[in-house]
Amino acid sequence: MNISIVVSTRDPVGETIKKLGYKFEEIDEDEVDFRFERGDAIVIFSKHQSSSKTPALTVHYPGNPSSQVLGGEPEKLGVAFPRLLTAIFREINKLDIPVQKTLEATHHGPTYQKVPIVFVEVGSDPTYWGNEKIVKSLVESTLSAIDKVSSLYCEEIIVGFGGPHYAPYFSKLGEKVCIGHIISKYYLASIKDTTIIQTVEKCMENVDTVVFDSVPLSVRDKVMHVLKDRNLKFKFH
């Protein structure tokens, strides 16, 4: 499998990776709205920002679950690749670095590509974006993970609904299962049927199970109704 590794010349983590001597694909585009598409899947390194400025290493898929857009298109998800995302996250979790390590729910663009995209991010301020030791460790873990994708152990492939944007429950599940799209609780009240369907259809691997994390009964019923004919299991937390 040909997995393209990408950095943006407009991104500070990308610049740190270049300083370290890595030769990855370079794009001169905003990382949340790029059009690059080469290979069977894309891994892009980028900065992570948060208001709390919590030091973190995060992994997630792109996609806009609502009409609110930050790059890409409204109500459109990117393509998920559960074994790739989960392999990367498991390797990052092994790092002896005192920062938060977490999956994030699906958010921001791009959404144009027909191949999966996984964001691997360093947060949450310039101190960490330019920290060569942390960035190098992240890159090496990701490269190691890519080599393990084809043989990665997955009890099942899941998609998730509910929980906060930083997804501790789904991050914990990732120790044994492989994770597709996660739609956080903030989008559920107004989520459209078409977006629910995309969580399953826009996945490189067949989804086995839908997992709900503290989701109201009305939303659970809606999701289960929309996906009722797809031979899926449903689990509740």
UniProtKB/Swiss-Prot annotation:
Its EC number is 3.1.1.96. One of its GO terms (molecular function) is D-aminoacyl-tRNA deacylase activity. It is an enzyme of class 3 (hydrolase). Keywords: Hydrolase, Metal-binding, Zinc. The keyword Zinc applies. GO terms for biological process: D-amino acid catabolic process. Pfam families: tRNA_deacylase. The keyword DNA damage does not apply. Binds 2 Zn(2+) ions per subunit. It catalyses: a D-aminoacyl-tRNA + H2O = a tRNA + a D-alpha-amino acid + H(+); glycyl-tRNA(Ala) + H2O = tRNA(Ala) + glycine + H(+). Its cofactor is Zn(2+). Disulfide bonds: none annotated. Monomer. Belongs to the DtdA deacylase family. D-aminoacyl-tRNA deacylase with broad substrate specificity. By recycling D-aminoacyl-tRNA to D-amino acids and free tRNA molecules, this enzyme counteracts the toxicity associated with the formation of D-aminoacyl-tRNA entities in vivo. This is D-aminoacyl-tRNA deacylase. The gene is dtdA.
